[in-house]
Amino acid sequence: MKDLSVNLLLEFPEEHRVERVLWIDPGMRGLYAIDIRDANALPEFYQAEEIEKMRDAGEWRVVENDPWLLALADENISEVYRDKRDSAWETIRPLIFDQPAIFDAIARSEAVKRGMEESGVTKQTIYRFLRRYWQRCMNKIKTHIR
């Protein structure tokens, strides 16, 4: 697991799935990752032994070219999308830095409830914003780009 890093993409060819590493336990006990193509994906925890076993069996490989790793300057984004992006960012910003808790389903549910109360945004919208953030390089710029 020492050769893995946050934001790295892992392809599982047999399952036609690509997952982004969201967080790695400092004690190297495991990591959270999310499927970047699944519109309903949520972070999933993998034990270190499980990841290493799958790697040794050739079940996943590192993706060299990240489709979301492109530089976008603000001036190249329309004002409408910038406003939507900024609004989405302000909604999830208080939630995303509580790591690893935000990746846990129960803790995330509580955080989303607080986010709903503070922002007036629906649960579905907050989950959509979080998903986009996690799936698209964990970068503010790409939270609302299609």
Identify the role of each PLM range.
Residues 1-146:
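Secondary-structure boundary/capping micro-motif
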